[in-house]
């Protein structure tokens, strides 16, 4: 199901967060469950599709902002970066010091005002299931309700977001793609294209 929505909603957040704006120009992908609303910026989605079109296993980090209002978790994924120092495999997912150094260097250079929202993983030929290694890696490094996992699964390149619920990772069912000016991600992509082929 794809739906294009043009609206300007202002949501009241709980705590000290104040108000936040939902993106105006969005497109829904899949059926969302209502408890989480994941907004993926279009440049980020384009980058992840291209990066994960390679035949080898790859991982990336997701950056942006997390908000909570009226019992709903809002993930605004504004940026993503390839993790070049990691060699993911279905039975081997290591977030060592080299990975975190790379991630924090990228954050410092391109995405200073954003937080880590989770990670993305592509394991071509492995299938759609989340094995114990994937779940353990997520819970060890991205535990909590404010982090997500984005998987690109199988031959059809099915895109699925997962969040922590009930002691494990569960699919959110769908997400939203939104469109806005995204200079930090554009700068990252320009530098990546100049330095290496993705």
Can you name each region flagged by the protein language model?
Residues 1-118, 124-197:
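N-terminal beta-strand/alpha-helix entry module and adjacent surface
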């Amino acid at each position: 199901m794809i739906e294009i929505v043009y609206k300007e909603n202002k949501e009241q957040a709980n705590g000290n967060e104040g108000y936040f704006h939902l993106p105006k120009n969005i497109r829904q992908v899949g059926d969302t469950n209502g408890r989480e609303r994941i907004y993926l910026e279009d440049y980020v989605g384009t980058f992840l599709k291209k990066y994960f079109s390679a035949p080898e296993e790859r991982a990336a980090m997701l950056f942006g902002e997390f908000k909570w209002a009226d019992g709903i978790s809002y993930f605004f994924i504004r940026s993503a970066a390839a993790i070049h120092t990691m060699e993911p495999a279905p039975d081997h997912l290591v977030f060592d010091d080299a990975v975190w150094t790379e991630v924090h260097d990228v954050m410092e250079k391109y995405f200073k005002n954003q937080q880590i929202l989770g990670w993305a993983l592509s394991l071509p030929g492995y299938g759609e299931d989340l094995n114990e290694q994937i779940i353990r890696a997520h819970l060890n490094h991205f535990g909590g309700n404010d982090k997500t996992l984005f998987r690109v699964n199988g031959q059809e390149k099915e895109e699925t977001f997962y969040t922590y619920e009930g002691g494990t990772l569960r699919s959110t069912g769908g997400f939203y793609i939104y469109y806005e000016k995204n200079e930090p991600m554009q700068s990252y992509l320009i530098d990546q294209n100049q330095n290496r082929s993705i």
